[in-house]
Amino acid sequence: MIPNEINYIYGLPAYITKLDPKLYEKNKILSQIEKNYKLSKARNKWAGDSFFKTEVHYLPEDKKNPKLKKINYYSLPQQYEKIITNFLHKLAPQKNFTSTNVIVNCTCIRHNSVMLPHIHTGCTFSLVHYLSFDKKQHLPTIFKSPYY
């Protein structure tokens, strides 16, 4: 994929870019995620009967757990808004768009587990942001064809 340009995967627009860690509190956010992870490394079995190990540290399950600290993402939405606006402008330069974005998930995986393919229902599009990614340890996001 070509960074900062519209690319097409299965006929659907995709956009890859880098977010400068100096523009948001990357280390603080990552530290909060890692502290929660250390308290409970694999408490969510993401898929029931799966050939793959799917034990992950998954944000939506954190909300009701008093032991885990709420992660403060306040520095990210403004940066996401810039990226989303740029993406939409590249799709249709003549149009003015308004959008809202919500951080609905944070997943921490460090122990040879995977998040299985899934669909984000109710979303016009999704954004994946890797705060920390080691090519030797992690599998990248894989896009499956929506046609089969």
Regions found by a protein language model. Name each.
Residues M1-Q94, V114, P140:
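Non-heme Fe(II)/2-oxoglutarate
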Residues G11-P13, T100-V102, C123-F125:
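Residues at beta-strand starts and edge strands
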Residues K70, Y74, Q78, T98-T100, ...:
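Alpha-helix initiation and capping sites
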Residues P93-V104:
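A short coil-to-beta-strand element that immediately follows conserved catalytic motifs
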Residues N105-Y148:
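Catalytic core of non-heme Fe(II) oxygenases with the double-stranded beta-helix
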